A protein has these predicted regions:
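Cytosolic juxtamembrane helix and N-cap/initiation of the first transmembrane helix
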Residues: 1-15
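Core segments of alpha-helical transmembrane spans in multipass integral membrane proteins
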Residues: 14-22, 39-63, 74-80
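Membrane-embedded alpha-helical segments of multi-pass transporters/permeases
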Residues: 21-24, 59, 87, 111-114
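Membrane-interface helix termini and inter-helical loops of multi-pass transporters
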Residues: 28-39
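Juxtamembrane helix-break-helix junctions at the cytosolic face
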Residues: 30, 57-70, 90-91
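Membrane-embedded alpha-helical segments of multi-pass membrane proteins
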Residues: 53, 81, 103-108
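Membrane-helix boundary connector in multi-pass membrane proteins
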Residues: 63-66, 84-101, 118
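Membrane-water interface at the C-terminal end of transmembrane alpha helices
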Residues: 108-121
């Protein structure tokens, strides 16, 4: 695996860790004042745990340098879906501008993952 892609995976792991922390109920309750909608703790813990699980996967791939194409393809699809959802909810006014910026980060990683997938066929 190329060094740039390992760094990209490590950066994605860090982004996911911060996302998992942001959605954890103790933190998220203070984030509601920033325009994020209120949610039941069950949903917040579910989202937080999935973000963390993907982050651990990114970290593991970066650490071992053993690419798992299926995981990277699923990650690209998930990142793209999140970026589209954040953009859609921002454009109709349901999410604050920060959601658009977060979506741009996810879109960047999705494109980078797809680039790597097509390049290493």
């Amino acid at each position: 695996m190329e060094k740039w892609f390992r760094y990209l995976l490590a950066a994605t792991a860090i982004l996911n860790l911060s996302g998992a922390i942001a959605f954890a109920p103790p933190i998220h309750s203070s984030a509601e004042s920033s325009g994020l909608p209120p949610a039941h703790p069950f949903y917040l813990w579910t989202i937080s745990s999935w973000i963390l699980i993907f982050g651990v996967g990114y970290f593991w791939l970066a650490l071992t340098a053993k690419p798992e194409r299926l995981f990277i393809a699923a990650a690209a699809a998930a990142k793209l879906a999140i970026a589209v959802l954040l953009f859609a909810f921002w454009i109709v006014g349901d999410l604050p501008l920060i959601a658009l910026f977060v979506g741009c980060g996810d879109l960047f990683f999705a494109i980078a993952f797809m680039y790597w997938l097509f390049r290493t066929r």
